[in-house]
Amino acid sequence: MKKILIVVDMQNDFIDGSLGTPEAEAIVDNVVAKINTYTKDCVYATRDTHQDNYLQTQEGENLPIVHCIEGTYGWQLNEKVQAALGSAVVMNKPSFGSWELADMMVMEFAGLPAEECEI
């Protein structure tokens, strides 16, 4: 059975940007340590991705805080996390939800904001 790690939305806006918190900043080193326990072919990451019209979207109406606009500093993965990920697959996601990994049987998640986005 292949075990994978999915690193969820470890982006600057969720760590120290428009939706950041001290708690989010505090977990960065732990997420990096977790990434480093996996081989890179077993690590995937998600990146919350919005466009300039975010506030006019359904999500933007419910959470009217501009964040993770594609191409901005806030959209980028945290520098330490990006370095640990190396060439791992990073998937942009435009909204709440999930993606299918049909061949994967065991998934472990690390990242932000798990209470709102993925699970």
What kind of region is each of these model predictions?
Residues 1-92, 110-113:
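Active-site acidic carboxylates
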Residues 92-110, 115-118:
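Glycine-rich phosphate- or other oxyanion-binding loops that anchor nucleotides, phosphorylated ligands
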